[in-house]
């Protein structure tokens, strides 16, 4: 691969120390296993990886995307080489790998970005799959133009916005074929990682992180990368089920973009009702638009955990990612959020009731208050005492 890890900054925290090696023995003494979480890098990784810009996806207009291409051989080489080296060098028990990224369709619909990926490697794979690449590119452009015009208020939609959207897909079925190709490519990367690590140590546990977008509000992810298709390349699945922060995230990342685009003919309350209906939540149990900032109920955690458990069908464990004290606001989060202790207890209980084999206290340890951790511990002990 052309990608190279840069030597760490000698002034950085823990520089020159083998952190995984140092953690192994203390973890063993406490009866704990040591897992690594590999986060899908974005364009920002160019600060740490030489050559990373060469593997970024390319949109329909030839512009670089901010995430790497699934099919680029140098990206796959970097990913597999890095993971092999880590598991051959350190006494790691498992990996949680997860790519937090929208699909090509949702990148356009929710993010206003170009339709991806049309690098030489994706084009070659598309041709091998029998897809007309030029038609896929043209359809992607038409879709982008429609969403842009809707956002600007210049679109002409005499038959209605949704009919106009469906007309694009009917005229260019290659767009959906390209979306399918993207999902297949991503699942293939997960399988390559799984096989590579099992070849090193069969007892290594390989898991898939399903981020908040994928688990909770992205219909294209729900249709294209389904839980029932994951157990052939994972030992466990960790769906993100952050109940309280989902309210603000839903408003910012789902309702507002659609209000400017494909669902602009609906009011915000109507769009929210449609979301609840599409994603299997009770309108009576969940908040209206005016209370959405307070988050969703523990029942949401039950619903999404149960969906993952039923999809895995006993072929992979499900560890529900419970959100604790996750800041709200744009980006990574800037506004401090203290989770309600009673709700924390309830969501842990709901996750296990739905069939989860375990939970993951999420998102970041340094964000979580001692009070929240104590409630989680009490809830887990209470659940296991009744089993």
Regions found by a protein language model. Name each.
Residues 3-18, 25, 33-90, 99, ...:
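Active-site-adjacent "subsite" loops/lids of carbohydrate-active enzymes
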Residues 27, 79, 86, 95, ...:
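Conserved, mostly hydrophobic/aromatic
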Residues 1, 42-65, 99-166, 249-268, ...:
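Aromatic- and acidic-residue-enriched segments that line the glycan-binding/catalytic groove
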Residues 98, 136-179, 224-293, 357, ...:
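Aromatic- and acid-rich polysaccharide-binding/catalytic face
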Residues 1-17, 62-80, 171-187, 284-298, ...:
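The substrate-binding groove and active-site-proximal loops of carbohydrate-active enzymes
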Residues 233-252, 277-384:
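Substrate-binding cleft of secreted/luminal carbohydrate-active enzymes
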Residues 46, 50-53, 104-106, 200-250, ...:
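Substrate-binding cleft/loops of secretory-pathway carbohydrate-active enzymes
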Residues 32-43, 96-100, 132-153, 177-222, ...:
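Aromatic-lined carbohydrate-recognition surfaces of secreted/lumenal glycan-active proteins
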């Amino acid at each position: 691969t052309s990608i190279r890890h840069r030597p760490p900054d000698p002034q950085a925290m823990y520089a020159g120390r083998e952190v995984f090696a140092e953690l192994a023995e203390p973890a063993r003494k406490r009866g704990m296993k040591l897992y690594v979480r590999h986060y899908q890098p974005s364009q920002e990784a160019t600060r740490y990886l030489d050559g990373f810009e060469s593997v970024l996806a390319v949109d329909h207009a030839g512009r670089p995307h901010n995430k790497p291409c699934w099919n680029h051989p140098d990206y796959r080489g970097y990913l597999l080489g890095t993971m092999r080296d880590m598991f051959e060098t350190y006494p790691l028990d498992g990996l949680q790998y997860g790519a937090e990224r929208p699909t090509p369709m949702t990148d356009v619909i929710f993010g206003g970005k170009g339709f991806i990926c049309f690098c030489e490697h994706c084009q070659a794979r598309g041709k091998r799959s029998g897809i007309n690449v030029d038609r896929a590119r043209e359809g992607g452009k038409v879709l982008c133009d429609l969403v842009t015009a809707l956002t600007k208020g210049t679109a002409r939609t005499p038959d209605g916005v949704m009919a106009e959207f469906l007309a694009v897909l009917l005229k260019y079925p290659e767009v959906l074929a390209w979306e399918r190709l993207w999902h297949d490519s991503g699942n293939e990367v997960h399988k390559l990682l799984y096989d590579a690590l099992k070849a090193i140590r069969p007892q290594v546990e390989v898991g898939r992180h399903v981020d908040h977008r994928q688990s909770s509000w992205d219909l294209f992810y729900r249709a294209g990368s389904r839980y029932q298709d994951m157990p052939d390349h994972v030992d466990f699945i960790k769906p993100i089920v952050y109940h309280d922060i989902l309210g603000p995230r839903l408003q910012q990342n789902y309702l507002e973009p659609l209000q400017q685009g494909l669902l602009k003919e609906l009011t915000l309350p109507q769009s929210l009702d449609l979301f609840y209906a599409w994603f299997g939540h009770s309108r009576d149990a969940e908040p209206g638009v005016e209370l959405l900032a307070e988050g969703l109920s523990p029942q949401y955690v039950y619903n999404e955990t149960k969906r993952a458990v039923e999809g895995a069908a006993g072929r992979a464990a499900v560890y529900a990612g419970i959100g604790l004290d996750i800041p709200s606001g744009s980006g990574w989060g800037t506004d401090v959020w203290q989770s309600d202790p009673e709700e924390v207890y309830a969501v842990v209980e709901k996750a296990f009731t739905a069939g989860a084999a375990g939970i993951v206290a999420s998102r970041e340890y340094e964000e979580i208050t001692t009070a929240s951790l104590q409630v989680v511990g009490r809830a887990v002990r209470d659940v296991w005492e009744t089993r």
